[in-house]
């Protein structure tokens, strides 16, 4: 029984950073204003020859494609290699969606089952696990951030080797996809997701710490009342 409790608790802690990161990734992927920000910042219009309205139209169609059942992105702007790579990107995004739903489902089921079984005694343990999960989120992103500062190229290469089973991501410098989405575009997107996840982790951890502090004070008062009663 103790082993099962430990395993389910560890999975709960793991699901916290998974849920935060996939949720923020989903938001970033679908938030068209982030695309607009990147296009303006990196002067994509000048690089591609497309005006801002055309760029946003392509981005909007791309977001729709990521959330559709279409196998390929039907657009003349990209060549076959780019379109095929975009299919792989869509698969990665859809995987993130599934991980988001799976982690959310596990967290909800875990909380409901433990509350039914343990009632009020569960809240202290839940608060601790939320703090651990929040801490794990911040630690993971801190490690990745430090790695990126020390050797970004190796992190970038490892991400693509793990994420894709082919070399289609190695596009030519003149390909429209690279011109539309330069490396800085993805760096900013990653920073947005990381900052959002860290902020959410701090909030969750802070609330959980507050719950522990309040319950600790309540228990302390009960002990004092009990001691005074006996006295």
Model-derived features: positions:
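Membrane-interface interhelical loops and short interface/amphipathic helices
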Residues: 34-76, 82
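Juxtamembrane interface at the cytosolic side of transmembrane helices
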Residues: 2-7, 104-154, 204-227
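C-terminal TM-helix exit segments that contain a strictly Trp-centered aromatic cap at the helix terminus
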Residues: 21-29, 67, 142-155
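Individual transmembrane alpha-helix segments
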Residues: 66-103, 185-197
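Hydrophobic secretory-pathway targeting helix
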Residues: 1-34
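Juxtamembrane non-transmembrane "cap" segments at the membrane-aqueous interface
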Residues: 147-174
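Terminal transmembrane helical module of multi-pass membrane proteins
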Residues: 167-225
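Membrane-interfacial loop-to-transmembrane-helix junctions in polytopic alpha-helical membrane proteins
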Residues: 1-11, 82-95, 122-129, 180
